[in-house]
Amino acid sequence: SVLHVFNWVSTLFMKPIPDSARRAIPFKFMIFSIAFIIYGGATAFLNAQIAPDSDFIHNTYWIPAHFHAMFFGFSGQMAIAGFYFLYPYFTGRMYNQTLGNWHFWLWQIGLFIKITGMGVAGYLYFPRWVYDYLQMPGWAESQLFITIGGYMVGLGFLIFVFNVAWSARYGKPAADDPWPVEGGEAETAAPAAPAE
């Protein structure tokens, strides 16, 4: 994973990235997915050690925090970035940039709050796989942060679904090359917008 991160980051510095690409939703999701793989990778060090794993974090919320950072923070965001990138090619229309930004920021902030709350809960020995538990100091607050973060991520995802559906019908028609970058790899023209 560390080699992948160095590869991705060094690739970003090979050529200057145009401002239009930096403002694009797929680029933002891709950059933050790299940040989340670093975050998730940092939690993996404790998972890989025998003593902390068996005495400290085994069957606590530390494990779901690591999973959410890697699965939703990295893999999920890369999939979303790919979807936003390919959306004009699939539909012939561009997605709504404002709704995309709302989705992006709600997802990032909510996911960070949720994962950090899970990590803190795991650090405080909050057990997983139980439906009822004692009220220990810090557990209720951690659960509150996890819940708030979860609602933010859920709201962001609902905005994403609405954006996909709305933009397929009412979005601006996409250009032949929706992502014009000098030396870009996109060699396929986007399909024409469906007739109304």
Predicted regions, residues:
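Hydrophobic cores of alpha-helical transmembrane segments in multi-pass integral membrane proteins
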Residues: S1-L12, F27-A51, Y61-G92, N96-A192, ...
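Membrane-interfacial, low-structure loops and terminal tails that flank and connect transmembrane helices
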Residues: M14-R22, E182-G183
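Active-site-adjacent structural elements in folded domains
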Residues: P16-I17, D55-I57, I146-T147
